[in-house]
Each structure stands twice: as C-alpha cells, then as structure tokens.
C-alpha cells in the first residue's frame, strides 16, 4: 500500500493506474462504517484510493478543528489490512495553497444546503464542496463512495457531479449499524453507557416510522408525531420528511422520501435517516 503525502506524488501515482479507480474520501478516525465503503470499492474497482484529510473549511466557528481525532497510524493499518491500493494524506497547505481571502469561492447549491444541517452549521456544506471538488480533481476516480447516513451531503455531491459535468459515478452506500442498530459514527465514542441506551431511541423511531409506512400510513404529520413520541427523552433538533430536493412533504412519496433526524444525547449530536 502506498502512502501519498503530496499532490505531486499522487498525480504521478494516478497516471500509472490504467484500470478502474474507486475513491473513498474520509476525515480519518475510521470505523466500520468507513470500512464498509472501502470494502465495496475494493469489490467494484481494480484500485482503491482512500483520502484521510481533516478539512478545515467545513468546521464552523463553534466547532473545534484542532480537537478532531487524528489516529493516522491506526487508520493506515486498517487500510493496509483491507487491501487499499493507496492512501492520500495531504497537509492543509497542499490542499489550500492560498489563504482564505485569495481563494476561489465555491458554494453548495442553496436549495440543498441551507436547511436541516445547513441551518445549524452555517457554511459547512460550502466547505464540503471545496474539498470534495479538489479531491475529485486530483484523484479523478471512476467511482466515489459516500454513506447514506450523511444524506444531505450525499445529495449535494450528486448535484455537484451532475452540475459540473464530472465523469464520476457516485455510489451511495447503505447506513452501517452496530448490533443495537445505532448508526455508526465517529461521534458515538463520546456517549457514555447511559447515553448510548438513550440514543437507541433514534433508530427505534425510524424503524417504527418505517413499519407504519409499510402498513399504509402516508400522512407525514402523523408519522412525525409517532417518531417524536419515541424521541421525547432526547433534545431533537429536527425530524423532517423531505423529497430528494429536500422540499418538505405532507405525504410519503415512494422512492422519493427522506426521513431525517438530528438529536442531541448529552453533549453529542447524532444524525440518522430513513430512505423510503
């Protein structure tokens, strides 16, 4: 496995690859959710490149960039064990050669980025677009793999690829869950045992909503009430029913409905969703 620290080395390496290239962009602190993305890429491509880069432009004013976990040696060991071809680990100065005031400004599309997570984390998705577009330009993958857990991010990246006419296939990957059904997240490590049990209300609420839909309930207001009753012990930021343009729905639309939830358990903010 190659560890690529500079853009020049990455470009030289990329030129040597003649067959399909799968790409899994990450901020490190890899868990089994990331592992499932990597494993799918390994199955579907001749080569797999993983990036590990904690992107400063997607951190808000109240989010501590310096405190984000960076267990690089552990991440590299996992990638090597899985059979990854190369890991790109650039410094911030490599990815952003200019200071903020000199940088080309890129913005996520407003209709997808200003609600839900965008309403809470102002500018977050602009930062995501900044780094993902740079990584796509450098890696030039055949396919890129993103988890459905970050649904809003996934929709924005799919829109980005289509809008900028990029020849990259975006591969959405199912949400990876622990045995207790909690969605895998690097934030889960901040939960103590009591909070962990409380957090299980999130997947339970989504499962109960799914069961109600399967039984024929289509009214989003009724389904939302059902979910909020289960989430009542948590501090809920939102429980919303939207289509794939993130427009609010009153009635379930098969194959075009997202149920999105964000809730705080203690000091930890967790996301989960259901694709209907």
From Swiss-Prot:
NCBIfam families: cyt_tran_rel, panC. Homodimer. It comes from the Bacteria. Belongs to the pantothenate synthetase family. The keyword NADP does not apply. It comes from Helicobacter pylori (strain P12). One of its GO terms (molecular function) is ATP binding. It is found in: Cytoplasm. The reaction proceeds by a bi uni uni bi ping pong mechanism. This is Pantothenate synthetase. Its EC number is 6.3.2.1. InterPro entries: Cyt_trans-like, Pantoate_ligase, Pantoate_ligase_C, Rossmann-like_a/b/a_fold. It catalyses: (R)-pantoate + beta-alanine + ATP = (R)-pantothenate + AMP + diphosphate + H(+). It is an enzyme of class 6 (ligase). (R)-pantoate binds at residues 58, 153. GO terms for cellular component: cytosol. Keywords: ATP-binding, Cytoplasm, Ligase, Nucleotide-binding, Pantothenate biosynthesis.
């Amino acid at each position: 496995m190659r560890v690529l620290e500079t853009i020049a080395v990455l470009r030289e390496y990329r030129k040597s690859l003649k067959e399909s290239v799968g790409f899994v962009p990450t901020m490190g602190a890899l868990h089994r959710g990331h592992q499932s993305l990597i494993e799918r890429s390994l199955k579907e491509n001749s080569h797999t490149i993983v990036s590990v880069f904690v992107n400063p432009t997607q951190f808000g004013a109240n989010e501590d960039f310096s405190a984000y976990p960076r267990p690089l040696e552990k991440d590299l060991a996992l990638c090597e064990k899985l059979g990854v071809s190369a890991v790109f680990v650039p410094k911030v100065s490599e990815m952003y050669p200019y200071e903020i005031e000199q940088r080309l400004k890129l913005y996520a599309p407003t209709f997808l980025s200003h609600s839900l997570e965008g309403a809470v984390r102002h500018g977050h998705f602009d930062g995501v677009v900044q780094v993902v577009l740079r990584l796509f330009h450098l890696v030039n993958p055949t396919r890129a793999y993103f988890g459905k857990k970050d649904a809003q991010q996934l929709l924005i990246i799919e829109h980005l690829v289509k809008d900028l006419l990029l020849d990259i296939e975006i591969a959405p990957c199912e949400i990876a869950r622990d045995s207790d059904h909690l969605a895998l997240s690097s934030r889960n490590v901040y939960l103590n045992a009591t909070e962990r049990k409380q957090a299980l209300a999130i997947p339970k609420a989504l499962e109960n909503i799914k069961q109600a839909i399967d039984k024929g309930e289509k009214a989003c207001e009724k389904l939302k009430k059902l979910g909020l009753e289960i989430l009542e012990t948590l501090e809920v930021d939102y429980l919303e029913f939207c289509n794939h343009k993130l427009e609010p729905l009153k009635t379930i639309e098969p194959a075009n409905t997202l149920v999105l939830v964000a809730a705080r358990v203690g000091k930890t903010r967790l996301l989960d969703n259901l694709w209907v």
